């Protein structure tokens, strides 16, 4: 998602939803709220503070060295970017279109390079051309194995779907759907899947 813009999230379906969020770089910064959010919070007795914490003013006082967030001015509000829907579309990779970008890796495992050009120290063309500070890769497979993956920068695995096996040296770990695994650096990693339908393992690494 582009920065310097306001965004909101809503579950538009009938089932419980999950958004897996990756923030670029090491400092996510401070959230800037639209004025209406802060105004409504104050009306209900809640207060958002300058460290992004939320307190109930009916039960607590503002801690020392903390300040109440005040609504930004109209002048500051005008400095944020606005995008048309067609302009945002280039930042979206639709699930149904991912099959057009699959790369065969080895033994039944395919790679879909969503963001960034690197996966396990090899370069690939990304679907979304956006400098985010991280790489987002997806491993796809029903039954397959890929060995000797090495990551020299902070990397996590997140199982979008399926029960994946991750082997590091002699140790084997089961990564079930919705599980997250932070990998050790500069260590050979093997990943395998054994299922009757396609499964997906997200890999996020620092660029």
Each predicted region: which residue ranges?
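A short, N-terminal "cap"/entry segment at the start of jelly-roll beta-barrel domains
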Residues: 48-140
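Short acidic-glycine-tyrosine-enriched beta hairpin
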Residues: 1-3, 169-187
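Structural motif
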Residues: 6, 163-165, 188
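Short, solvent-exposed loop/turn positions at domain surfaces
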Residues: 135, 145-147, 153, 169, ...
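Conserved hydrophobic/aromatic beta-strand scaffold that supports enzyme active sites
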Residues: 8, 21, 136-140, 156, ...
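Double-stranded beta-helix
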Residues: 6-86, 190-207
